[in-house]
From Swiss-Prot:
Keyword Cytoplasm assigned: yes
Organism of provenance: Pectobacterium atrosepticum (strain SCRI 1043 / ATCC BAA-672) (Erwinia carotovora subsp. atroseptica)
HAMAP family to which the protein is assigned, alphabetical: 16SrRNA_methyltr_H
Designated gene of the protein: rsmH
Family per similarity comment: Belongs to the methyltransferase superfamily. RsmH family.
The name this protein goes by in its record: Ribosomal RNA small subunit methyltransferase H
Amino acid sequence: MLENYKHTTVLLDEAVNGLNIRSGGIYIDGTFGRGGHSRLILSQLGPEGRLLAIDRDPQAIEAAKAIDDSRFSIIHGPFSAMADYVAELGLTGQIDGVLLDLGVSSPQLDDPERGFSFMRDGPLDMRMDPTRGSSAAEWLMKAEADDIVWVLKTFGEERFAKRIARAIVERNRTEPMTRTKELASLIAAASPIREKHKHPATRSFQAIRIYINSELEEIERALEGALSVLAPQGRLSVISFHSLEDRIVKRFIRHQSRGPQVPAGLPLTEEQLRSQGGQTLKPVGKKLMPSEAEVAENPRARSSVLRFAERLPA
């Protein structure tokens, strides 16, 4: 069933090239997905190189079985626990590069049984790991209207959040929603104005998905984890797909690259400043966006942003 859902890896070459792969290095693909980035990394590693992949989606773990390579291993779990996985392997501070491809994948969106898409009818689930936590239907059934409003506004910037939340609560009082099409139709009916070329449920589905999977908190923890496992000169390569994700990545790199704030004019070298603590990363190059050709081939790449950073010596 896995092969039925095609996945085109976004910014494939750019994201991997930014890792500056060393033949004998140790790398982490924190979001295996269907293995596009992992396969390219493996193709650039020598016999002594190693690649550790992570994914919390059981279908991704199943897809990884197709990679028969002694240099490769995969862990089923959230990338936010990266530091723990690496510590268990005794490799803290020895990782030469970490790649993160954030958000929901095409196979997750395209499989109606996963419940991520308002375009295809399926169970109202939305969990990246269906074996853990509450589904979207379960959460919506027990959530108060104010809680739903907060989620829709915070993670979806939905201006009709109150109308939609009220409609959800009223519907669930009479007959619980269990299908994606039910929720999408309800949101469309509750939205008085429609944006051109945008389904009324787009923002709400994004918001509920982000909340159900704790996506933004997971990203923050994953970035901290990457920082803790990287070796000096190790690279961080992160692809984000919407402004909420990119804002977290941008702020993290900026904060970690600023270092201690000291009065201007103090005669301190860069090494002395680093010894004060705080400056741990330096940005590498400018953010990258997909080319027009890539967007034409894969419209879902349109909103992607790729950022790089390099670990500074302690």
